[in-house]
Amino acid sequence: MTIALTIGGNGFSGLPGSSFSSSSSSFRLKNSRRKNTKMLNRSKVVCSSSSSVMDPYKTLKIRPDSSEYEVKKAFRQLAKKYHPDVCRGSNCGVQFQTINEAYDIVLKQIKNQMEGTEEFEPFDVYDEGLNGMNDPDCDTWEEWMGWEGAGTRDYSSHVNPYA
């Protein structure tokens, strides 16, 4: 995606007071006059943004059918090589940013594919393993909690050697 925008001056909206809109925003340029002068203040703003990741798989040096683990491994290797704190070349910051963008794009694609293939089973309360005293297999509950007297009022099986 490439976005370029020029405001004011002799650029895109050369006339003061003119208005235009871009794909995501609209702008209005107004006249600005100084006191006691007839000069117009004009300003020129140029913005440019481009995603330099043409093929994120090629950037990360992976196959399109790579797993999430392989993507993360490739990203870590390239990040170690091109991180601005490690790499002393003149273009390392740009390369590192490109690698980050490619990594984000590929991970989003993998996550979207995973969301489409997940199947959800309805939650069944009665399929839980331990339902306490309401468990149809109450022997397990008694065996597990019986030493504390759960479900019984007879504590004679407890022997206190200090009493």
Curated annotation (Swiss-Prot):
Keyword Transit peptide: yes
Record GO biological process: response to light stimulus
Keyword GTP-binding set for record: no
Boundaries of the annotated transit peptide in chain numbering: 1-46
Subcellular location field: Plastid, Chloroplast
Main location: plastid
InterPro entries in alphabetical order: DjlA_DnaK_co-chaperone (IPR050817), DnaJ_domain (IPR001623), J_dom_sf (IPR036869)
Stretches assigned to the J domain: 55-127
Any one GO cellular component localisation term in the record: nucleus
Keywords on record: Chaperone, Chloroplast, Plastid, Transit peptide
Main function: Plays a continuous role in plant development probably in the structural organization of compartments.
Protein family (similarity comment): Belongs to the DnaJ family. C/III subfamily.
PANTHER family associated with the record: CO-CHAPERONE PROTEIN DJLA (PTHR24074)
Name of the featured protein: Chaperone protein dnaJ 8, chloroplastic
Species assigned in the record: Arabidopsis thaliana
